[in-house]
Amino acid sequence: MRVGAGWWQGWWVLGVAGLMAWSGAARADAVLDWLNRASAAAKQLNYSGVYVYHHGEHVEVLRVLHRADANGELEKIEVLEGTPRQFLRINSDVYCHLPDGKHVRLERNAPRRFFPAILPAQLGDLLEYYDAKLGGTERVAGRSCQVVTLDPRDGYRYAFSLWLDKMTGLPLKSRIINSNGAAVSMFVFSEIQIGKAPGVQVFRNDLAGKRIQNASLDKPASAIWEVTPPPGYQQVQEAVRSLPGKQAPVTHLVFSDGLSVLSMFVEPVNPQMQSLQGLSAEGAIGVYGRQVDGYSVTTLGEVPSMALIETGNSVKRK
């Protein structure tokens, strides 16, 4: 009888272990399904609404209009308070209409998108660096949402919480949370209409009498600089920009793991201006600066200090 009992107990343990493994895989598949829905919804649905962006002590109110049809994507973002700003996406090109009303900054094949399109199209690599779990159900802008949490697997990124509309999957709220459990920044819709396409006329790109500033590249930064970002981060953008108050063009690099983003600016040292040395912060954005062979290197982003410091310290001139 004891042998029989041991045999049964052994199979019972294996059965429970198998059930737990299957249950874990099923939960992972369910989370991935939600994230895939959210990624597709932000790009493929028609919607319009107003959302609030909280970062540090600052608050901005923005209007988004998004249209998807046989011709592709149209998106318009308007800042509703303070200095007027407007961004217009026509498929992969983004036009930033500057406050002076005279200049438009054009970025072709822009990789980064605006909220609610915060998730990448390919999610497989993302889950190597985040542990994604389903939370409860909460309401945002009067709509029922599924909460999804993404906890970092290392110290190079913060945690994210997403509130996804249960009917469509569209992200209606997102929050970045640091290692102390405090909110770094948050987007949240106060009103949203999903399903009705905004008229094509609202996306008219008025360029009459305006000067278009193209981000240009005379020579790839990789030909001059060697940069090693944290694990999981890939370079997604590179440009040379003329920025206000800068005497020389600035090389701008963007690195992302698909969710977290950090930027790097490289410019010649201006002896008449004090450049940042060490770690600092601009509201919710961490900033790290150092000098390399007569150039100022600045890394910044809503990421842990370790990511900024290691990326900045990795920069070498070839």
Which positions does each model-derived feature cover?
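N-terminal signal peptide c-region/cleavage motif recognized by signal peptidases
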Residues: 22-25
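Surface-exposed amphipathic alpha-helical segments
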Residues: 168-170, 177, 181-200, 298-318
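Pro/Ala/Gly-rich low-complexity, hydrophilic intrinsically disordered segments
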Residues: 188, 193-224
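Short, solvent-exposed recognition patches
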Residues: 209-295, 306-307
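N-terminal mature ectodomain segment of secretory-pathway/periplasmic proteins
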Residues: 28-100, 128-166, 170-174
